[in-house]
Amino acid sequence: MYFAGGMTMNIQIFGTSKSFDTKKAQRWFKERGIKFQMIDMKEKGMSRGEFDNVCRAVGGWAQLVDESAKDKDTLALLQWLDESQQADKLFENQQLIRQPIVRNGRLATVGYCPDAWEKWA
């Protein structure tokens, strides 16, 4: 999809079908006629490269953590691991990641962020 200035939007939405915010993100892009690729995190998840790029884009792995995730044991474990192990543990346990993750090339957001997406257009 091309916009003013010739910028191309290549939107990927990472989330699950049960996530209310993921559904809202899909609706936001559909209403604006912006094509996107939906990746179900329960089926596929993020590759390590995608995970690392999202971490860089949002200011670190800690921005991705869903503090209200159901897996309280792994959530607690994250706090006690060495810093070098924390990102690896989060990557291995993607059910702890806030949804949706929306990527546009090197840009990314965590959660429902229509104000940020508006700036991409």
Q: What is the predicted function of each stretch?
A:
Residues M41-A121:
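Thiol/selenol-based redox catalytic cores and closely related redox-interacting motifs
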Residues M1-T8:
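Short, Lys/Arg-enriched N-terminal segments with co-localized hydrophobic residues
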Residues T8-R32, F36-M41:
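Local sequence-structure signature of Cys/Sec-based thiol-disulfide redox active-site neighborhoods
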